[in-house]
């Protein structure tokens, strides 16, 4: 029982509104909250293959007392038998909350292990409404591995889904079976989990002894087998027997014998090596940050220039500088280039600004004094930043020579490499790379949108990235303007150099919310750890090969992805093809990342994943990771939108969903000639149609007129966003605040704030007297119902009437003496707090319409806010699109043809 006092906010005293009111369903649906979804008892489907398998299992089970057939792990006994008896779909989905793999095995009297499989639990999607969105918080289906394939069975022997996820946790043995399923086969990879490398770092092998297969070059891992009395090891990727170096059983500190099973690489599927000299072409370079700052009239007027300078001053000491070799340079840009020459602190306190007026043939004056040591020049950099803020505060130049600035910066640091961080409020309009405003009228929302508005306007922005990749340079963009800046063209710079684009439309530094968002994201970006001179390769065992790559990097060869610098907040998707029939019971993937750290070390991060193989289509479907599938389809849709059209991207999403549903019906559903034909799918896939339906309503793909900068930015973000953020972006989280539990808003034993349960993304569940918090991954909307009682308004906002609620872009003020206000603020802070992303979510306060109003009534700003917030109701008929039920009805009709 909670000790926190809960205040109950009664429903306002009013009658039901007239039917058909825009945006709200006036008759509330009792008992349709997601937590109250009616689950049916599972009825496993029986295919010929499965029938044979079940008969075999039944015979074996007669002699066993602890046989488990339904794959509901007992995580208190991780290496013992599982529970008996049939389980509900809800229990089937209730995997270990940490998402670790299932290594349980049931053993017969003779000691022979019996292969476990995930069972199919079919549901009717149309009877399973509203969709059970709690599934979005579940880990992937268990990976069923026998402990005897690992040298040291443990939950660390196979890679965590935090690092790598496969769309299929049971891999078809043949390409024909894969094609038959119509399911995508891909890996979703996130090499780093935190912005700071010191947080939960994986085990490190510092011995510089690296054991690799001499044929396929995979690294020894927990699934390698020691053979011939331990003198050799068999590669689990290509099956080659390799010699084991004598040092493998010796301590690197002394000559004592060590237990090889205690070695880091044998116990851990995710680990790092300190790389020996043969992995180094040149000594690890120092970290170099070059800031290209717009000082034109636009940047001065909207406050971006001052915001940048103030943030840099505060964050200089927090730039990664572990080895005291970090360097910095600053280039100010308008119609000319203004490069800062800063002396060491112990030499002089006077800096110079070197002006380069010839932007067609820019030269670099005094190059040795333009890229300076942060440790030796920190005080003078601070002084210079304060001085230039005064010098440029009344600049009237309207030009912005970005192209010449980029070329100059590339010459400055090209011998070493590093980061170019561009902060701009203007469309480049001087020198090479000048851009023109594109005419969006009559083009936006048509089939010509991609080719005329979302394409690269100037080839410079693609060819320059090739030069940057050769010289190990990454480009990041911070674009903040209330006017057109051609995100579609500029975003090519980060896309092919492993960078990121940050976009702040309508930026105004005098608005504290705008200022906080920019400064927070800019600060987190420049202070997060990064890797230099990085390459990443994914290997598959015999028969498996990487075939396509998605993300922000430069693809150097057929399977090698190059990152001039690797950030900590991006993920990558690699498609997998089955080249030859897989003859083994298990297959393997290994991701290797070779990198240089800010501490001067060269390292190799190795991530190894083992998956079972199968010839059963039912087992393949039972092991699909629906969120990983959603990530892969999103990448293909982004590629289609950029190369073809938005319409084609939506068609791809819809066709892929239809193909999966049709295949499931054809291969796994027993034909029922009588009664209504249901739209069947397995429980582990039941949220995928919802995600695909919502994805088509995302700003990146929705039909209609969308400003091209916003569309291009949305597409760019989807290219690199990790799964967790991707799902929130596709299907926003809506928290019901007015009736949240007593403990919500307070911290738990781990220090995290307890969040309310989410409700479905539909206005049907939005009470007109309620308070809701909407999180779409980029922004937060605090929605207060138009009929909210005065007590709620007083407790949350400190005002007695709706007319006094501060609508718009505002942070929620603290109300003295109100515990409820404190809890709401704590929840908002929790949703903004994350050490794995640089995103800071701006809060918008929105008041809903009263009983006699519609969405469009009120001020223009309020009506726009309501419509923007309402885009989160993806299950409804928003923006002239189908509701989720209508979408399923359409799918059912197509499947039944």
UniProtKB/Swiss-Prot annotation:
Gene Ontology BP, a term: COPII-coated vesicle cargo loading
Report residue spans for region: Zinc finger-like.
213-238
Q: Is Amino-acid biosynthesis there in the keyword field? A: no
Q: Which residues bind Zn(2+)?
A: 213, 216, 235, 238
Q: Does the keyword Transit peptide apply?
A: no
- Record localization: Cytoplasm; Cytoplasmic vesicle, COPII-coated vesicle membrane; Endoplasmic reticulum membrane; Golgi apparatus membrane
Question: CDD domains in the record, alphabetically?
Answer: Sec24-like
Q: What is its main location?
A: cytoplasm
**What residue range is the signal peptide?**
none
Q: Which GO terms describe its cellular component?
A: COPII vesicle coat; endoplasmic reticulum exit site; endoplasmic reticulum membrane; Golgi membrane
Q: Which GO terms describe its molecular function?
A: SNARE binding; zinc ion binding
Q: Name one Pfam family in it.
A: Sec23_helical
Q: What membrane topology is annotated for this entry?
A: Peripheral membrane protein
User: InterPro entries given for it?
Assistant: ADF-H/Gelsolin-like_dom_sf, Gelsolin-like_dom, Gelsolin-like_dom_sf, Sec23/24_helical_dom, Sec23/24_helical_dom_sf, Sec23/24_trunk_dom, Sec23_24_beta_S, SEC23_SEC24_subfamily
Q: Which UniProt keywords apply?
A: Cytoplasm, Cytoplasmic vesicle, Endoplasmic reticulum, ER-Golgi transport, Golgi apparatus, Membrane, Metal-binding, Protein transport, Transport, Zinc
This molecule's function is given as: Component of the coat protein complex II (COPII) which promotes the formation of transport vesicles from the endoplasmic reticulum (ER). The coat has two main functions, the physical deformation of the endoplasmic reticulum membrane into vesicles and the selection of cargo molecules.
Q: Which PANTHER family does the protein's record reference?
A: SEC24-RELATED PROTEIN, SECRETORY 24AB, ISOFORM A
Q: What's the family?
A: Belongs to the SEC23/SEC24 family. SEC24 subfamily.
Q: What does the record note on quaternary structure?
A: The COPII coat is composed of at least 5 proteins: the SEC23/24 complex, the SEC13/31 complex, and the protein SAR1. Golgi apparatus membrane; Peripheral membrane protein; Cytoplasmic side.
Q: State the protein's name.
A: Protein transport protein SEC24-1
Question: Which source organism?
Answer: Candida glabrata (strain ATCC 2001 / BCRC 20586 / JCM 3761 / NBRC 0622 / NRRL Y-65 / CBS 138) (Yeast)
Q: Which gene encodes it?
A: SEC241
